């Protein structure tokens, strides 16, 4: 999908897509000719061009839009670089705490298959000692969103859990391309620090 605005109707226009990194796209450069309807003056939002092609997941591209109007004036080309094409859903693995496990501190171990834009870690009391602040919606921030495994970490915004409470941990998120992750749940986690 592309977004673009044309100030006037064009006689000719093309979008050139060049693979500049990530996975190799052997078809690069790809030249996509715009159709007559796609060359009319106006704004185009989230548009799938008629002659578009499937790109390669995990490739990085540069897009350049060129055009000529009916008087054969050449428009200034417009280029957008470093477009990371990503259609793969990220995977979150919550390693610690484990379902039916116990914790004596707010340590968690998790693994992200790729860097996340945002994650939601919700810790909800489901039994044991009452926790009047439950559910805890934990904001995972900055370096905590990086791809890879994080071992036995106390998340920056970790809540204070209640001794003797039993919790459900639910972890989900979206990657930099807004692909939604799986939802991972660990039920019946006892917090016991005495």
Language-model features, listed with the residues they occupy:
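Short proline/glycine-enriched turn/loop motifs at strand-loop junctions of beta-rich domains
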Residues: 7-12, 112-118
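Aromatic sugar-binding surface patches on proteins
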Residues: 38-50, 141-155
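Conserved structural position at the C-terminal beta-strand
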Residues: 65-67, 171-173
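Beta-sandwich strand segments
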Residues: 71-78, 177-184
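Flexible, low-complexity linkers/stalks enriched in Thr/Pro that connect modular domains
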Residues: 79-93, 175, 185-194
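Surface-exposed, short loops/turns at beta-strand junctions within beta-sandwich domains
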Residues: 52-60, 156-166
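Short, solvent-exposed loop/linker segments at the N-terminal edge
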Residues: 98-104
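Structural beta-strand segments of beta-rich domains
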Residues: 1-2, 104-108
């Amino acid at each position: 999908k592309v977004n673009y605005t044309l100030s006037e109707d064009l006689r000719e226009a093309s979008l050139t897509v060049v693979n500049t990194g990530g996975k190799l796209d052997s078809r690069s450069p790809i030249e996509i000719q715009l159709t007559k309807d796609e060359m009319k003056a106006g704004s185009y939002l989230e548009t799938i061009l008629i002659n578009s092609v499937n790109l390669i997941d995990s490739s990085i591209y540069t897009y350049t839009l060129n055009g000529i109007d009916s008087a054969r004036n050449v428009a200034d080309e417009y280029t957008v670089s470093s477009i990371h094409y990503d259609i793969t859903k990220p995977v979150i693995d919550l390693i610690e705490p484990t379902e039916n496990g116990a914790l004596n501190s707010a340590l968690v171990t998790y693994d992200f298959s790729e860097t996340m834009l945002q994650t939601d870690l919700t810790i909800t009391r489901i039994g044991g000692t009452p926790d009047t602040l439950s559910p805890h919606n934990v904001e995972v921030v900055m370096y905590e969103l990086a791809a890879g495994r994080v071992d036995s970490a106390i998340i920056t915004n970790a809540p204070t859990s209640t001794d003797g409470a039993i919790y459900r941990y639910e972890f989900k998120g979206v990657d930099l391309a807004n692909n939604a992750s799986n939802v991972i749940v660990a039920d019946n986690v006892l917090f016991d620090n005495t």
